[in-house]
Amino acid sequence: MPDSRKARRIADPGLQPERTSLAWFRTMLGYGALMALAIKHNWHQAGMLFWISIGILAIVALILWHYTRNRNLMDVTNSDFSQFHVVRDKFLISLAVLSLAILFAVTHIHQLIVFIERVA
């Protein structure tokens, strides 16, 4: 069994590299679609905090794109999972997804409050 990930992929590619690549690409597309929806539905009532969060989310989307692009270029060693930049990228991806979910939750809760006030 070859030691490097790239050599193993060349020796027996299987479907795992393709599935992983497609999963990251699907994550990036879904993330982009959610960002577009956030801008579409909230631009009219957006304050400075909204635009700052959209800017941060766009930066993290670029990091996600960079991370998925570099997955095919790197060889994985045992220390790669403890290196700072790898852990940072994964943390920022998770943080971006969480913050986008919170943004949508707050927006929907606000809409529910407005609806309940109109009904009452």
Curated annotation (Swiss-Prot):
It is found in: Cell inner membrane. Residues 1-21, 69-90 are cytoplasmic. It is a multi-pass membrane protein. Residues 40-48, 114-120 are periplasmic. Disulfide bonds: none annotated. The chain crosses the membrane at residues 22-39, 49-68, 91-113. GO terms for cellular component: plasma membrane. It comes from the Bacteria. Keywords: Cell inner membrane, Cell membrane, Membrane, Transmembrane, Transmembrane helix. This is Inner membrane protein YidG. It comes from Escherichia coli (strain K12).
